[in-house]
Amino acid sequence: MRITLPSGTPAEIDLSVANPVMGLVIMPDIFGMRPLFDDLVAQLAREWNMAVIAVEPFPNQTLSADIAERMACVPLLSDDAVLRDMHEAADALGVARVGLMGFCMGGMYCHKEARSDRFARISSF
């Protein structure tokens, strides 16, 4: 289900698991939210018994699938805003223990987030 974080950033969330063992925030790659990540959120929630959310890395932007266009937008991202969105996403899950998983560019943000103690586990691909 699509939600909007308090910051205004869209996210895909699955809270269908009755008693999740923990939560998981997913940071997509440079191509952002798309059906692949919508499906991954649902699959990991179901298979790993977790509350899961994925966050759009380029909120308020309409970008094509062109890699050059997206690469040009990366320097415009605010690390503080992306890290804030990750924390807001974790809060939206409603569980105490939350892990973080990032893919490519999202993995870079996992490494940046490692300096905080918000996430119990961090995995970067």
What are these regions (language model features)?
Residues 1-94:
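Serine-hydrolase catalytic machinery in alpha/beta-hydrolase-like enzymes
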Residues 89-125:
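Primarily recognizes the serine-hydrolase "nucleophile elbow" in alpha/beta-hydrolase
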